[in-house]
Amino acid sequence: MANIKSAIKRVKTTEKAEARNISQKSAMRTAVKNAKTAVSNNADNKNELVSLAVKLVDKAAQSNLIHSNKADRIKSQLMTANK
C-alpha cells in the first residue's frame, strides 16, 4: 500500500474508475448480446435493442473503453444483421 497521501488518493480514484469502467463495459456487452439474439429471433423490439446497443457502444468508444474501430465494427455487424 502507498504511504504518500496523493498516492493513496490515486489508488482510491483508480479503483472507483475501474469499477465504473467494468460496469459500463459489461452493460455494453449485454446490450450487444441482447440485440444480436433479438435480431436472430426476429423479435418485435429488435430495432429498440439495436439502437440501445449502438448508443452504449458509442459511449464506450467515447470514453476509451473500447477502440473506435472496434465500436465501428460492432455497430456495422448489428446494422447488417438488422436489415
Swiss-Prot record:
It holds the Pfam family Ribosomal_S20p. Keywords: Ribonucleoprotein, Ribosomal protein, RNA-binding, rRNA-binding. Coiled coil: none annotated. It comes from the Bacteria. Transmembrane segments: none annotated. GO terms for molecular function: small ribosomal subunit rRNA binding; structural constituent of ribosome. InterPro entries: Ribosomal_bS20 (IPR002583), Ribosomal_bS20_sf (IPR036510). Signal peptide: none annotated. The keyword Ribosomal protein applies. GO terms for biological process: translation. One of its GO terms (cellular component) is small ribosomal subunit. NCBIfam families: S20. Belongs to the bacterial ribosomal protein bS20 family. Binds directly to 16S ribosomal RNA. HAMAP family: Ribosomal_bS20. This is Small ribosomal subunit protein bS20. It comes from Staphylococcus aureus (strain NCTC 8325 / PS 47). The lineage of its organism: Bacteria, Bacillati, Bacillota, Bacilli, Bacillales. The gene is rpsT.
